[in-house]
Protein backbone atom coordinates (compact mmCIF):
# COMPACT_ATOMS: atom_id res chain seq x y z
CA UNK A 1 0.00 0.00 0.00
CA UNK A 2 0.88 3.68 -0.04
CA UNK A 3 2.23 3.32 3.50
CA UNK A 4 5.24 1.16 2.53
CA UNK A 5 5.50 1.35 -1.24
CA UNK A 6 4.50 3.52 -4.19
CA UNK A 7 2.24 1.27 -6.29
CA UNK A 8 -1.06 2.74 -5.10
From Swiss-Prot:
GO cellular component: extracellular region
Single Gene Ontology MF annotation: toxin activity
Primary location recorded for the protein, binned into one broad class: secreted
Record-annotated disulphide pairs: 2-8
Keywords: Amidation, Disulfide bond, Ion channel impairing toxin, Secreted, Toxin
Tissue: Expressed by the venom duct.
Cysteine amide PTM positions: 8
Source organism superkingdom: Eukaryota
Cellular compartment(s): Secreted
Domain remark text: The cysteine framework is C-C.
Function as written in the Swiss-Prot or TrEMBL entry: Its target is unknown, but this toxin may modulate voltage-activated calcium channels (Cav) or calcium-dependent potassium channels (KCa).
Family from the record: Belongs to the O2 superfamily. Contryphan family.
Protein's recorded name: Contryphan Li981
